């Protein structure tokens, strides 16, 4: 018999070396790798699949058997934080980037927050209550002052 996983939380290793979460009636797992690569149509690497399976199985009682595999490009800001806001030097350009390996988890909140910022409204109360501010998301925080 299968496990009742629908209500399981996102589970992530303390060192961020793997994670899994319920998704569409199955578990979505990842080795949480951050390999630098040029933009391209990335494909799942057999080594990454095996590494993710090994890490999850070593830390849990799960026996991982993939039914599908996929890969994707992820963007990371230099400070590791999410980026959402108007570019201070490119009028009309709005950044929504830096979701790294957390895009699946952060997309609903980032979508709501960035929609508000684009429309010139304050961040939704449920985001502001948790301390999120436009300044924390702003791409301006990443600008390096000229020397």
Label the predicted regions.
Residues 89-147:
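C-terminal lid/capping helical subdomain adjacent to the catalytic/cofactor pocket in oxidative enzymes
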Residues 2-92:
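Active-site lid/adjacent beta-loop-alpha segment flanking the redox-cofactor pocket in flavoenzymes
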């Amino acid at each position: 018999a299968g496990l009742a996983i629908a209500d399981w939380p996102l589970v992530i290793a303390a060192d961020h070396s793997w994670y899994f979460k319920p998704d569409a009636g199955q578990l979505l797992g990842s080795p949480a790798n951050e390999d630098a690569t040029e933009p391209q149509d990335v494909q799942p690497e057999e080594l990454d699949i095996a590494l993710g399976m090994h890490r999850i199985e070593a830390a849990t009682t799960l026996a991982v058997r993939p039914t599908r595999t996929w890969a994707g490009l992820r963007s990371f800001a230099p400070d590791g934080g999410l980026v959402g806001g108007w570019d201070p030097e490119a009028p009309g350009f709005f950044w929504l980037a830096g979701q790294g390996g957390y895009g699946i988890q952060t997309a609903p909140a980032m979508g709501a927050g960035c929609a508000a910022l684009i429309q010139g409204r304050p961040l939704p109360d449920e985001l502001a209550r948790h301390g999120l501010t436009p300044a924390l998301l702003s791409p301006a925080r990443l600008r390096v002052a000229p020397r």
